[in-house]
């Protein structure tokens, strides 16, 4: 095999091509590849941070939901206690009012009874006086006396 000028020219051309590529083509390609690798690494790191942030946010949301449920249950419990208290107060007030009304009714009945007794005593006294007057007007005869007493008893 003989080395001729064509082969030597091709070798020199290839060497110049390689030098040109190393000097002018290779650095921008490497920069582009490195930038792309950096973007991918940053994207993966961001995705990892986002996943952690999402996990933290979900944990926080779950905790807040639990706290909200506890708070809601406490509020409901307080409302139920207040409701029971209001009902008890209303019952006590109603019982007091009922007792007051009953006491007033009993007092009115007692007053009316006393008034009726007084009226009845007055009427009995009036009838007794009337009977005594009639007895005194008539002669003190036993038959007349019995007749007047029977009439008085019938009137009473």
Curated annotation (Swiss-Prot):
Subcellular location, record wording: Cell inner membrane
Gene3D superfamilies per record: 6.10.250.1580
Any one GO MF annotation of this record: proton-transporting ATP synthase activity, rotational mechanism
Residues spanning the membrane: 7-29
CDD domains: ATP-synt_Fo_b
Keyword terms of this UniProt record: ATP synthesis, Cell inner membrane, Cell membrane, CF(0), Hydrogen ion transport, Ion transport, Membrane, Transmembrane, Transmembrane helix, Transport
Transport as UniProt keyword: yes
Membrane topology: Single-pass membrane protein
Gene Ontology cellular component list: plasma membrane; proton-transporting ATP synthase complex
Top-level taxonomic group: Bacteria
InterPro entries: ATP_synth_B-like_membr_sf (IPR028987), ATP_synth_b/b'su_bac/chlpt (IPR002146), ATP_synth_F0_bsu_bac (IPR005864), ATP_synthase_B_chain (IPR050059)
rRNA processing among keywords: no
Quaternary structure, from the entry: F-type ATPases have 2 components, F(1) - the catalytic core - and F(0) - the membrane proton channel. F(1) has five subunits: alpha(3), beta(3), gamma(1), delta(1), epsilon(1). F(0) has three main subunits: a(1), b(2) and c(10-14). The alpha and beta chains form an alternating ring which encloses part of the gamma chain. F(1) is attached to F(0) by a central stalk formed by the gamma and epsilon chains, while a peripheral stalk is formed by the delta and b chains.
Family: Belongs to the ATPase B chain family.
Function (record text): F(1)F(0) ATP synthase produces ATP from ADP in the presence of a proton or sodium gradient. F-type ATPases consist of two structural domains, F(1) containing the extramembraneous catalytic core and F(0) containing the membrane proton channel, linked together by a central stalk and a peripheral stalk. During catalysis, ATP synthesis in the catalytic domain of F(1) is coupled via a rotary mechanism of the central stalk subunits to proton translocation. Component of the F(0) channel, it forms part of the peripheral stalk, linking F(1) to F(0).
Name by which UniProt lists this protein: ATP synthase subunit b
Originating organism: Shewanella sp. (strain W3-18-1)
């Amino acid at each position: 095999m003989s080395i001729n000028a064509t082969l030597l020219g091709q070798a020199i051309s290839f060497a110049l091509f390689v030098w040109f590529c190393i000097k002018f083509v290779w650095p921008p390609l490497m920069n582009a590849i490195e930038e792309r690798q950096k973007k991918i690494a940053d994207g993966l790191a961001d995705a990892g941070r986002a996943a952690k942030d999402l996990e933290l946010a979900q944990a926080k949301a779950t905790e807040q939901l639990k706290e909200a449920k506890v708070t809601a249950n406490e509020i409901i419990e307080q409302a139920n206690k207040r409701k029971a208290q209001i009902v008890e107060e209303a019952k006590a007030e109603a019982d007091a009012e009922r007792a007051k009304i009953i006491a007033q009714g009993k007092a009115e009945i007692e007053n009316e009874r006393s008034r009726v007794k007084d009226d009845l005593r007055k009427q009995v006294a009036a009838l007794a006086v009337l009977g005594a007057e009639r007895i005194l007007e008539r002669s003190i005869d036993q038959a007349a006396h019995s007749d007047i007493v029977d009439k008085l008893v019938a009137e009473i």
